[in-house]
Amino acid sequence: MAVYHLLLSSPPSLLLLPPSPRRPNLTLIRRIPAHPRLGNSTSLLSSSSPVIRKILVRSTLREDQPIASDSESSPTLLIGEDSAAFELGKQKLVSWVYFGVVLGVVLFILNVVWIDNSTGFGKSFIDAVSNISGSPEVAMLMLILIFAIVHSGLASLRDIGEKLIGERAFRVLFAGISLPLAMSTIVYFINHRYDGSQLWQLQGVPGVHEAIWVANFVSFFFLYPSTFNLLEVAAVDKPKMHLWETGIMRITRHPQMVGQIVWCLAHTLWIGNTVAASASLGLIAHHLFGAWNGDRRLAKRYGEDFESIKKRTSVIPFAAIFEGRQVLPEDYYKEFVRLPYLAITALTVGAYFAHPLMQGASFRLHW
């Protein structure tokens, strides 16, 4: 799962529509056309100060029309980017061919350097961690801890790293170190998920399997917003730190954390033993820290823009909507009828039916 996230993850920023000729209804302002002298207002809205954004809004109004205060306009003026926007006409075939080549090369290197027991270091790494205590629960927690330190640590050093070696080189370094650790953790969990002590047994209870399946299906819609910028993940396009605001972000500001918690609870309920509980404990703790660290990094990068989005979003799903801080547009459903979400749907169904293949491949590694 974590491997899939690292391989997957650019949509253009959202433009805003002009208001009606009369006194504007700010609840309807969503797009501002590009000014002929300013060029594309997208980058200005996503990176400029609140004063510049107000000037852009003023350009769509008559001179005698007042501009609402930040508190009045913040629920409607989109500062961040439109998540999951994908325009097929703007895609370049050469970029996706390059993406396929990069993916193939990465998987080949990963197999030689880490996966293949005759040439790679994966088994030696797993054995070293397992021999620390001999307990599968401790080994599971240790693997997650190592991955979390490397993954979150490198993410925290992103600004410094990109200045030193560039965005693309840092992305390659980040993925090159994180990917083997993530795969080791996943394979160990698959191979040892039924070790440890059984805490409960619900697999024979009617309706439990169906409920678990639905929970896992829903979790993937939260887990992988990174599919919004696939070409950046592979460093085909220059990687950027995005400030998403629409789609799943309206429900929760940290969809990966929510998705991981749902996934962990579902699998722990189904497996019902100490190894699954240990894995869930480690993964949830890592994502809770990641949510805090992510907010910290976005606040440092975007300043007031992030604070404005933070005020009208929530960490707890639907909280901002119920509290009235997030006002959903009438056509909100259209933010989900997009290719990335359709791809997630297909991949989630495919992953379910591919479980026997994943389990067989993991078992053959003897990790």
Swiss-Prot record:
EC number: 5.2.1.12
Transit peptide, residue positions per record: 1-58
The protein's name in its UniProt record: 15-cis-zeta-carotene isomerase, chloroplastic
One MF term in the entry's GO annotations: 9,15,9'-tri-cis-zeta-carotene isomerase activity
Induction info: Up-regulated by light.
Phenotype of null mutants: Lacks carotenoids in the dark and exhibits delayed greening when exposed to light.
GO cellular component, one term: chloroplast
Tissue: Expressed in leaves and at lower levels in roots.
Swiss-Prot/TrEMBL keywords: Chloroplast, Isomerase, Membrane, Plastid, Transit peptide, Transmembrane, Transmembrane helix
Lipid bilayer topology: Multi-pass membrane protein
Source domain of life: Eukaryota
InterPro entries in UniProt: NnrU_dom (IPR009915)
Transmembrane segments: 95-115, 137-157, 172-192, 211-231, 269-289, 339-359
Catalytic reaction annotation: 9,9',15-tri-cis-zeta-carotene = 9,9'-di-cis-zeta-carotene
Function: Isomerase involved in the biosynthesis of carotenoids. Catalyzes the cis- to trans-conversion of the 15-cis-bond in 9,15,9'-tri-cis-zeta-carotene.
Single biological process term from Gene Ontology: carotene biosynthetic process
Cellular localisation: Plastid, Chloroplast membrane
